[in-house]
Amino acid sequence: MRKSLITKWLFVSCIMVIAMVVIGGITRLTGAGLSIVEWRPVTGILPPFSFESWQAEFAKYKAFPEYNSVNYGMTLSEFKCIYLLEFIHRLLGRMTVLIYIVPLIYFYFKDVIKNCDMLPYIIALLLFCVQGFMGWYMVKSGLLNSPSVSHFRLAFHLIIAVIIYHILFYQLIKNRCDILLIPSQTDLKLPLIFSGIAITVIYVQIFLGALVAGLDAGLIYNSFPLMGDHCIPMEIKDNFFNLANLHDPVFIQFIHRLGSYSVFLVVVVLVICLLTIEHPKLNKIAYFLMIALLMQISTGIITLLYSVPIIIASIHQLFAIILLSIIIWCYFLINSS
């Protein structure tokens, strides 16, 4: 009963975090992220209802750079569309925190979760608090002189969400999954190492993907596998090792492409390691990994070739989380055997 309660709670929390990541990505891709120019964690829980309140929100938006530089002449109806998308993103964030923290308090005082097991849940709670601040810190960067958010703040905002998901998902499978029964003579060192490496490179790739989104780097060099006619674009070829490149969309797209090759290579090696063990559950994970990897790569290529269609780009982001989840599951099973 205790495990069942925790499992259901963690499952819902994981789904909510995934929804937050996907809707956050859509908010970024549609340019809706700067439509709400205030941070009101408590009083901002309700949207405008009257015509006058909508006009007031629109007037606030007009006072900031994005309206004058990007959306000048936007109608109130058009403003409502981007406002409501950002509002849903923020509302979902509040709901996610409530869905996480209320049961956590209950479980703690009812001794459903033991004191010795509380650390990861407390870390996740602290990260939720940091995430709320980071979201506003990111938005604030686009309300100053430039009508675009800092791509670094955007990337950290995403990575914090992924770390929260990682913690919750690991606790979920820890409560839900049985330990693998593998003969003691079976060598699991190599798949354990490569699953750890795979998790690391996917984290890096997710971070780079956020930089690509923040710089609109997916809207240039819409060709594959070459960037135009070159493997290394001419803009960065003669000045590759320069910190200024971290603000260059061409360089960031190039590094993200390299990251995708790294993910492909590491995951394929991991799949081979899992298949050589000849264990039914690990073999099943290997097949899931290949499907998720192929989906992730194909949606990434389509996103690039067609200049970032929102639906495909969102699916691409979702499969990054799915791929990471499968590898976390794999790592847990091997590490616990």
Swiss-Prot record:
Gene Ontology terms: cellular component: plasma membrane
UniProt pathway: Porphyrin-containing compound metabolism; heme A biosynthesis; heme A from heme O: step 1/1
GO molecular function: metal ion binding; oxidoreductase activity, acting on NAD(P)H, heme protein as acceptor
Subcellular location: Cell membrane
Catalyzed reactions per annotation: Fe(II)-heme o + 2 A + H2O = Fe(II)-heme a + 2 AH2
Binding site for heme: 256, 316
Name of this protein: Heme A synthase
Organism: Rickettsia akari (strain Hartford)
UniProt xrefs under HAMAP family: HemeA_synth_type2
